[in-house]
Amino acid sequence: MVHGTAVLKSEYDGLGLSVLWVVPNEGTKGVVQISHGMSENKERYLPFMEYLAERGYICVIHDHRGHGGSVHNREELGYLYGGKNKAMVEDLHQITIWIKEIFPDLPVYLLGHSMGTLVARNYLKYFDNELEKLILTGPPCENPAVDLGLLIARTQKRHRGGRYRSKLLETIIFGTFASRFAGEKSRFAWICSDEEVVKAYEESPLCGFTFTADGFEGLLMLLKETYRKEGWRLQNPQLPILFLGGEEDPCIGNGRKFVKELQYMRQVGYRHVTGKLYPGMRHEILNEKDKLTVYRNIYQYLEK
């Protein structure tokens, strides 16, 4: 397989978007575009990308703005450059168009994780006709406190500036996640049951950073727009959509809330929405101890 990288200039504001891809040596079946989660970087998905590439799928991922290589400097990790939710969605779509220009005859599948599912679902409102299938892992559930969070983010942004790192919002949003695993060593224990994965995440300068007020505003706008019933163009109601999560993932809430996420997409008008929860797994099911089971399930879904 062949690995490659590039930097594309965002059509939204000119920010450099760092892109990584893996291409099979032969027999390409399609392209899997990946939309990663909050406070992480694209390279964490390489094992999964290589697994799919070995089975005939090209994989492409870019660092969302404010992440990995899509920043002017590392001091701006967690800063969205004032682009809010709109820029992240437009960036994702720009990468899709770029993929289609290079591989015009191949179907494009989109996989989003965590915050990346919010970007993907916002994208879906406008561009569902670009995709063959959509897969969502660790999808955040609806949160009734989203407006309060937005008020805090905007107040902090106004008084302290967009680059101010909001420990308050970090605690409000993620404090309860950590408290579910309070007996474990790391405050990031909620992301994965594999301590080595958590340790690597904690030690990486590209992971676990606190979002800025500007970043939290964008994140919360993504969350709010995901669950706003207005604005869905529904150009492709036949699009197959698969929700996947870990039963012990506090981000999806619980089994009942997970089912509500599926039901919501059906209410919007999508006719082929399915889901699966994995016992014993936490937030990052692609990094869990039994991740190969998840890899296989995703591969089988792509092959259907």
Say what each PLM segment does.
Residues 1-26:
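N-terminal cap/lid segment of alpha/beta-hydrolase-fold proteins
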Residues 32, 36-40, 114, 247-248:
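Active-site glycine-rich loops that stabilize anionic/oxyanionic intermediates
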Residues 44-75:
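Conserved alpha/beta-hydrolase
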Residues 80-101:
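Alpha/beta-hydrolase active-site loop
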Residues 103-114:
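Alpha/beta-hydrolase fold nucleophile elbow
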Residues 120-206:
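Alpha/beta-hydrolase-fold enzymes
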Residues 243-245:
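Short beta-strand/loop motif that positions the catalytic acidic residue
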Residues 268-304:
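Catalytic active-site module of serine/aspartate enzymes centered on a nucleophile-bearing elbow/loop
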